[in-house]
């Protein structure tokens, strides 16, 4: 989990016209919401928002908000980011103000480590779930969850319930869900079957 810092400005005016003006000034319109508070409209410099989400943690980076009146020094994560369908640029951002002592639910990417023995034997790696839903304290949000697939053989899978998780992190997905598998038969068996078919 990476910690970032980002300047924000409160704004009293909302609407499509205001949002367009902000974007033309290299600002991103947004809203900050959280437990026990009314949503607050804000604007953020485009490059600052980019920097706040830089690195492996991405939208799960823990951000210290600077400015914004009562929001100053609050901690937040990016809950939702809208992009332009054509340009891919940021259109609007939702920031979730978090309490460091209260658990929250986030989506974390899965990263595979190593080359599966089943792939070396001619199998095909099937990476079915690239993300996991987890629950943890804000300070324990992992940048990613790593799975070592080195010993994964043909016709075998690694399920959600078999994944080693960082301390303080609880996975919410069905423990029986296969995350990564090796499909197919061992290369030697496939070759033997092909030879038998030709004979």
Curated annotation (Swiss-Prot):
Quaternary structure, from the entry: Part of the 50S ribosomal subunit; part of the 5S rRNA/L5/L18/L25 subcomplex. Contacts the 5S rRNA. Binds to the 5S rRNA independently of L5 and L18.
Function: This is one of the proteins that binds to the 5S RNA in the ribosome where it forms part of the central protuberance.
GO biological process: translation
Annotated organism of origin: Pelobacter propionicus (strain DSM 2379 / NBRC 103807 / OttBd1)
HAMAP family: Ribosomal_bL25_CTC
Similarity section: Belongs to the bacterial ribosomal protein bL25 family. CTC subfamily.
The protein's name in its UniProt record: Large ribosomal subunit protein bL25
Stored InterPro entries: Rbsml_bL25/Gln-tRNA_synth_N (IPR020056), Ribosomal_bL25/Gln-tRNA_synth (IPR011035), Ribosomal_bL25_b-dom (IPR020057), Ribosomal_bL25_C (IPR037121), Ribosomal_bL25_long (IPR001021), Ribosomal_L25_dom (IPR029751), Ribosomal_uL5_bac-type (IPR020930)
Pfam family, one: Ribosomal_L25p
Top-level division of the source organism's lineage: Bacteria
Keywords in alphabetical order: Ribonucleoprotein, Ribosomal protein, RNA-binding, rRNA-binding
Gene Ontology MF annotations: 5S rRNA binding; structural constituent of ribosome
Gene Ontology cellular component terms for the protein in this record: cytosolic large ribosomal subunit
């Amino acid at each position: 989990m990476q910690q970032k810092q980002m300047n924000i400005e409160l704004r009293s005016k909302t609407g499509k016209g205001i949002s367009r003006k902000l974007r033309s000034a290299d600002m991103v319109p947004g809203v900050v919401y959280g437990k026990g508070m009314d949503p607050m409209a804000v604007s953020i410099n485009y490059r600052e928002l980019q920097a706040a989400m830089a690195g492996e943690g991405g939208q799960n980076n823990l951000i210290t908000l600077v400015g914004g009146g009562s929001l100053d020094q609050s901690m937040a994560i990016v809950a939702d980011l809208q992009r332009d369908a054509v340009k891919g640029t940021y259109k609007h951002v939702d920031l979730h103000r978090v309490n460091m002592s209260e658990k929250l639910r986030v989506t974390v990417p899965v990263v595979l480590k190593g080359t599966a023995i089943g792939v070396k034997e001619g199998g095909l790696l099937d990476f079915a779930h690239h993300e996991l839903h987890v629950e943890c304290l804000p300070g324990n949000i992992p940048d990613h969850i790593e799975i070592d697939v080195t010993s994964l053989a043909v016709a075998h899978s690694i399920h959600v319930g078999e994944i080693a998780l960082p301390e303080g992190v609880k996975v919410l997905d069905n423990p029986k869900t296969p995350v990564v598998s090796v499909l197919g038969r061992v290369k030697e068996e496939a070759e033997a079957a092909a030879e038998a078919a030709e004979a």
